């Protein structure tokens, strides 16, 4: 089964062709980082406008690289949520149009489920990735979400924990802004941390008792308090005659230990994520831990989980950690096996949860 996937939930315009939920025939991503860097984060209005101008060329290239035309496609898959409403709307409208004109089934996909299914994908030229065996503990870590999920089968998810405030990726973005490292924050923090010494400063870890929930807002505030000792001028936004104010980074004195603070901040985030995930894998008898989402590309998180997990750890290659359409097409294959379809009145669901049911004890599994 060949599925064309479309992903426009935030600031990447993406289209991909995937065979049988596993094999990537093409995976085209057009990033908007250059557009949003000057603002210190994603501007939703600008993101949706860029999707409008990018989506058709991206689709054309995805089909061209896959070497197929519309007649070879069995279904159209699209992200229905969660994400930015204006961005999601572009992808959904295009997907509905193609489904109507080409007379193909339309499959709606949860963006978070797509991130999980990136772990099933094999890129062109790679050895085939074996299918994971259930049950799995999945750590979904991105700019907008941090969730720990028990996956007992295709479509069978139970929520173990989630962030109570900032997502891990959001925490990295905010910390990078405080440190003057730019956007996106995750790669910037990781690069700076490579030159730093974690432990020179002591930033808090929010363990929240035996809970599998997460909290990163206190960590961000603690970093701010340390930086205030070195600050010459706070961060600010300057309109400069533009419709959206530009972000101007803070200024610090020459002695500010940016690399050490980045290393300690990263260590604090990674330690909590990894420890709770490894504990969940033990408690619920997982056969494997899956990392998913943009923060899954973080080398320190990957390494720490490999060190302490009681079971093997799998994570996608970096190109499949970021938002992409191959993961949407991959997830759609397994949805199609369960008969999931959408009508042409499919709408945006900006706050769509992956799962609402919470597992409180291992015995409930």
From Swiss-Prot:
Single GO BP term: tRNA threonylcarbamoyladenosine modification
Keyword Cytoplasm carried by entry: yes
Binding site for Fe cation: 111, 115, 323
GO cellular component terms attached to this protein's record: cytoplasm
Sequence positions that bind substrate: 140-144, 173, 186, 298
Main location: cytoplasm
EC supergroup of this enzyme: transferase
EC code: 2.3.1.234
Domain of life of the organism encoding this protein: Bacteria
Compartments reported by the entry: Cytoplasm
Keyword terms: Acyltransferase, Cytoplasm, Iron, Metal-binding, Transferase, tRNA processing
Cofactors named for this entry: Fe(2+)
Reactions this protein catalyses: L-threonylcarbamoyladenylate + adenosine(37) in tRNA = N(6)-L-threonylcarbamoyladenosine(37) in tRNA + AMP + H(+)
Cofactor: binding comment: Binds 1 Fe(2+) ion per subunit.
One GO MF term attached to the UniProt entry: N(6)-L-threonylcarbamoyladenine synthase activity
UniProt xrefs under HAMAP family: TsaD (MF_01445)
Family from the record: Belongs to the KAE1 / TsaD family.
Physiological role: Required for the formation of a threonylcarbamoyl group on adenosine at position 37 (t(6)A37) in tRNAs that read codons beginning with adenine. Is involved in the transfer of the threonylcarbamoyl moiety of threonylcarbamoyl-AMP (TC-AMP) to the N6 group of A37, together with TsaE and TsaB. TsaD likely plays a direct catalytic role in this reaction.
The protein's name: tRNA N6-adenosine threonylcarbamoyltransferase
